Swiss-Prot record:
SUPFAM superfamilies linked to this entry: Ribosomal L27 protein-like
Name of the protein this chain belongs to: Large ribosomal subunit protein bL27
Keyword Ribonucleoprotein included in the entry's annotation: yes
A biological process term (GO) from this entry: translation
Native source species: Streptococcus gordonii (strain Challis / ATCC 35105 / BCRC 15272 / CH1 / DL1 / V288)
GO molecular function, one term: structural constituent of ribosome
GO cellular component, one term: cytosolic large ribosomal subunit
Amino acid sequence: MLKMNLANLQLFAHKKGGGSTSNGRDSQAKRLGAKAADGQTVTGGSILYRQRGTHIYPGVNVGRGGDDTLFAKVEGVVRFERKGRDKKQVSVYPIAK
């Protein structure tokens, strides 16, 4: 009888295993920035500017939300203005009837 001894057979990979990477993801865009243009007519409650922090400050008839979003308090015309030497603000002026 012919006996085959295959007890010590070991196979090796001909390519190294592909490692993982910590890259390959990105966060969703937050859609920040101006939502109303200078001179545009808006209604009360309209969002004027979405921001993180206070890049632009609230002016006349403009409120600031909890996430620093600027919104119109009254119906009127949007105006982007300077506030002092190095700051900006946005105001809403009611339309004269």
